[in-house]
Amino acid sequence: MGSVRTNRYSIVSSEEDGMKLATMAVANGFGNGKSKVHTRQQCRSRFVKKDGHCNVQFINVGEKGQRYLADIFTTCVDIRWRWMLVIFCLAFVLSWLFFGCVFWLIALLHGDLDASRESKACVSEVNSFTAAFLFSIETQTTIGYGFRCVTDECPVAVFMVVFQSIVGCIIDAFIIGAVMAKMAKPKKRNETLVFSHNAVIAMRDGKLCLMWRVGNLRKSHLVEAHVRAQLLKSRITSEGEYIPLDQIDINVGFDSGIDRIFLVSPITIVHEIDEDSPLYDLSKQDMDNADFEIVVILEGMVEATAMTTQCRSSYLANEILWGHRYEPVLFEEKHYYKVDYSRFHKTYEVPNTPLCSARDLAEKKYILSNANSFCYENEVALTSKEEDDSENGVPESTSTDTPPDIDLHNQASVPLEPRPLRRESEI
């Protein structure tokens, strides 16, 4: 009995023992690199897939069928179209059959099925089940061919006609409403909202930042668009409690309002890795051994329907590129701006990115190089401008700003000819 209690109330259950922790973190998530116990690294399962679907299965749900039937409208909206069409057809056919049986029983009890009887029938021209079924269809769909009609002989028949008319209106309203709600769901809008394949960590304005890119493939806007992010990882509390997926908010500018974006062209979302960030103690070496997932969420209202949509994606630790930046996609033309989505997922390496954590960088344990680093964004913009000028017949300049044999990864050690640079926002 004691052994049973020991297994039952142990700090980490046998199932949790099977989940190998890549790191056992302290403080705000990752420690400083000295307090970690590294185990055999494994590729964790995604909690949120790249297409936004949650990788979760519910089991042992009590009274699942009753709970789904209690919220039948939401159930009809969420199910697949094939099942929705089955419910659509069954709702009408079963109601026609039910009331057809009722009118047939009324005719049977009143003796209307006897052809030799000359008394007034409850429902004229209803002398078989087929005729009763057709009368039910005509009543509920308000067709009224004129051959079959209810009489004042039987009050029950009159009541059933009124009752079927009301039931038919309810079925029409429910089924048509569910179909329209399903068609108007903004879920398909997510097909034209994209996240970059990889997130990056690089310096921006003198601070180490986590960045990812979002884009809108439609010209219609996403109203009140805003972003948020969470870091998911396993951890053990100071009391010994094991939390399989601890959710930690990642600040993307909620307090200052910069989490709200104007998503006309692709935008890079920036998370400044400061002392409040769960990535504050994470270095390049720690990133290679880390086991976590960053879930990114984009929310907004569809301009056409004013319905709220949510687009999701996630990045595992091995999908975050340290020391990279995104290639520019927005270029200024003569009378408009051009967005090149072929560059949307592309990145380039920034050689001078510090490999230490943001904490070490803030404590001046890593000295940043003062050498002028090569600005790839400006080079791309100038190259694009030269290509456009050559297409328009403008002769190319014979002078070059950069020697052709220079390795781009070693630009920090090569003196560049001074020239006016342009920010990516200006590109």
Swiss-Prot record:
Chief place where the protein resides: membrane
Keyword terms of this UniProt record: Cell membrane, Ion channel, Ion transport, Membrane, Potassium, Potassium transport, S-nitrosylation, Transmembrane, Transmembrane helix, Transport, Voltage-gated channel
Regulation: Activated by phosphatidylinositol 4,5 biphosphate (PtdIns(4,5)P2).
GO biological process: cardiac muscle cell action potential involved in contraction; magnesium ion transport; potassium ion import across plasma membrane; potassium ion transport; protein homotetramerization; regulation of heart rate by cardiac conduction; regulation of membrane repolarization; regulation of monoatomic ion transmembrane transport
Motif (Selectivity filter): 142-147
Residue intervals on the Extracellular side: 107-128, 148-156
Modified residues (S-nitrosocysteine): C76
Annotated motif PDZ-binding, positions: 425-427
Intramembrane segments: 129-140, 141-147
Cytoplasmic topological segments: 1-81, 179-427
Entry keyword annotation includes Cell membrane: yes
Family from the record: Belongs to the inward rectifier-type potassium channel (TC 1.A.2.1) family. KCNJ2 subfamily.
Name of the protein in question: Inward rectifier potassium channel 2
